[in-house]
């Protein structure tokens, strides 16, 4: 695990974008695992700038998003499909057929989850997975005490996650209580992982994930066992880390 501590959110975003750009430039048909939320927005903004300078080509890239709220249609501004279209996909030359995001309105969730795993396998697995980390140590929507053997599945969101995500909605009551998420096993099979975190609110989770014991109670702690993880965090998120 390589840990890069930067001064601020902007620097974190630029470093992450540079790594993603390198991945796509070196392997134009890369399979990218993508995250949503506040943390990666700056990275996507930087990626768009790199693309506009004609240094990236997304025409052969395939993407798989980590998760999607259950019960939100793709036109809902709070859906992660809407987020991805408006923060990245509408601004680059990606083939829309190569975009994969769980269907939060699927009639048969079990079939949807199995099909998502099948698509990842058919694509050859994920070359580079982008992750954020929740205040409770979750990655994707894999909440504490999730099995490390889990694949794509329907998740019951816990109170901390609902509370944290309520800032994106008009009220806490509007936050979906379930989501479809790639599982820990799905994530850990990625060839390379970049974990992003910014701000003091993430410092406990970052410290436990990196310095603590490997436990399902802190889902991100499993990343200690992965052979190629880069953690890019600002000073505040790193404030409780033991870097010796």
Swiss-Prot record:
It holds the Pfam family Glucosamine_iso. The keyword Hydrolase applies. GO terms for cellular component: cytoplasm. The active site is at 67 (proton acceptor), 136 (for ring-opening step), 138 (proton acceptor), 143 (for ring-opening step). GO terms for molecular function: glucosamine-6-phosphate deaminase activity; identical protein binding. Pathway: Amino-sugar metabolism; N-acetylneuraminate degradation; D-fructose 6-phosphate from N-acetylneuraminate: step 5/5. InterPro entries: Glc/Gal-6P_isomerase, Glucosamine6P_isomerase, Glucosamine6P_isomerase_CS, NagB/RpiA_transferase-like. The keyword Hydrolase applies. It catalyses: alpha-D-glucosamine 6-phosphate + H2O = beta-D-fructose 6-phosphate + NH4(+). Keywords: Carbohydrate metabolism, Hydrolase. Its EC number is 3.5.99.6. GO terms for biological process: carbohydrate metabolic process; glucosamine catabolic process; N-acetylglucosamine catabolic process; N-acetylneuraminate catabolic process. PROSITE patterns: GLC_GALNAC_ISOMERASE. PANTHER family: GLUCOSAMINE-6-PHOSPHATE ISOMERASE. Belongs to the glucosamine/galactosamine-6-phosphate isomerase family. NagB subfamily. Catalyzes the reversible isomerization-deamination of glucosamine 6-phosphate (GlcN6P) to form fructose 6-phosphate (Fru6P) and ammonium ion. NCBIfam families: nagB, PRK00443.1-4. This is Glucosamine-6-phosphate deaminase.
């Amino acid at each position: 695990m390589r840990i890069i501590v930067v001064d601020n959110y902007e620097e974190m975003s630029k470093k992450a974008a540079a790594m993603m750009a390198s991945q796509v430039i070196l392997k134009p048909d890369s399979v990218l695992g993508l995250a949503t939320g506040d943390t990666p927005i700056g990275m996507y903004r930087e990626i768009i700038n790199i693309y506009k300078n004609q240094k990236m080509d997304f025409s052969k890239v395939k993407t798989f998003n980590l998760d999607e709220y259950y019960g939100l249609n793709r036109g809902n501004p709070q859906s992660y499909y809407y987020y991805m279209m408006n923060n990245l996909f509408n601004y680059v030359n990606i083939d829309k057929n190569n975009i994969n995001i769980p269907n939060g309105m699927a009639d048969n969730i079990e079939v949807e989850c199995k099909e998502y795993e099948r698509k990842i396998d058919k694509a050859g697995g994920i070359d580079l997975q982008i992750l954020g980390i929740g205040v409770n140590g979750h990655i994707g929507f894999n909440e504490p005490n999730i099995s490390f053997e889990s694949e794509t599945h329907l998740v019951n969101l816990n109170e901390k996650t609902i509370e944290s995500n309520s800032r994106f909605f008009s009220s806490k009551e509007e936050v979906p209580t379930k989501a479809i998420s790639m599982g820990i096993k799905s994530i850990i099979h990625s060839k390379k992982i970049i974990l992003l975190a910014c701000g003091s609110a993430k410092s406990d989770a970052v410290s436990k994930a990196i310095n603590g014991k490997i436990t399902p109670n802190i889902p991100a702690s499993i990343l200690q066992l992965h052979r190629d993880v880069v953690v890019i965090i600002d000073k505040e998120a790193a404030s409780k880390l033991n870097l010796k």
